[in-house]
Amino acid sequence: IGSGPCTFISETAGTEMELGSFADYHLGTPKFGKLVLKVVSASNTITSVAAGEMDAFFQSPSMDDALAAKDLGMNVEEAANPTSVVVFLINNQNVPDKRIRQAMSYAIDKELLIEQNMRGNAVASATCIIPGSEYDKGIAWSRDVDKAKALLAEAGWDGRTLHMVVTAARESMAAVIQQNLADAGITIDVQTVELATMFSGLQDGTYDLGICGSNAMVYPLWMAGYYDYRNATYCQISDPKLAELQDTIAAEIDPAKKKELVNEYQDMLYDEMPLVILYHGYSFAVKSDRLQGFNAFEGGVNNEKSWN
């Protein structure tokens, strides 16, 4: 019994799982005999590695944890390229005019969010394409509250209050965004809920706005599901043109033509602004000295390293 590179050995429900190395794995036999996965408190990850109780942990450490690990002389690595993304979700059915969504993008102070939440270890982004990556067209975002106000006026913004929902971990971000949007003339109220409630409420139209985060990939279509009208997306997108272009990109095998299509895709994303990419963040990894051949930054959404 197993999955991919591992075979199942044993499990203690909710506590621990032991996996073995699958000798016939199609990408080669993993270079470990046994892999033990343990559930530990997030507050104990750094101390557990420092004490030799574990070799690494899946969740990327916070900035504070990474700095603390460095102070302890531990093995701390920083990703060479951004590996995460934070997204401002907009219900497109409740906010159907793209000019309103564009105004939100111009109004939000992404650089302040980066400083407060990532200590500068992130880059403000125009679209889901990672800035500086091979598919990046170079669309530059900058905050412009006056332009946001002009777009709202052009769209005939009715001044209604929008309802934003976040988890407790995003409350400080929500406070900044609430003030930023107020500066441009958009009033929002903020409610704190559990993650599942946020996503279901965005999908069924209960809420207008939200914030989520994810791993990010260089592969240009890694966020395709967010924009596909055929899915029950968090942004309630009904326009098929993004999904149609995504299908065309996926089917194109000529690299130069694919690059041209991805450029068109970025233009469309930036114009339609179905959601706002706040920033792409750099992540850190903390691991024991004995753990070799492990790249903590390749555990993304899809196995793109093997595809390429």
Residue ranges and their predicted role:
Residues 1-30, 34, 44, 145-146:
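Gly/Pro-rich hinge or "lid" segments in bacterial periplasmic/extracellular proteins
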Residues 43-55, 67-71, 99, 175-184, ...:
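Short helices/loops that flank or line small-molecule/ion binding pockets
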Residues 285-308:
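Long beta-strand-rich cores associated with HINT superfamily self-processing modules
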Residues 189-198, 223-289:
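Extracytoplasmic/peripheral linker and loop segments enriched in polar/acidic and small residues
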Residues 153-216, 283:
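Ligand/substrate-recognition segments at binding pockets and active sites
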Residues 96-179, 183-184, 264:
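Append "and occasionally in soluble cytosolic enzymes with long acidic Gly/Pro-rich linkers
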Residues 20-25, 74, 78-103, 107, ...:
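A bilobed periplasmic-binding-protein/Venus flytrap-type ligand-binding module shared by bacterial periplasmic
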Residues 22-67, 187:
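Ligand-site clamp/hinge motif
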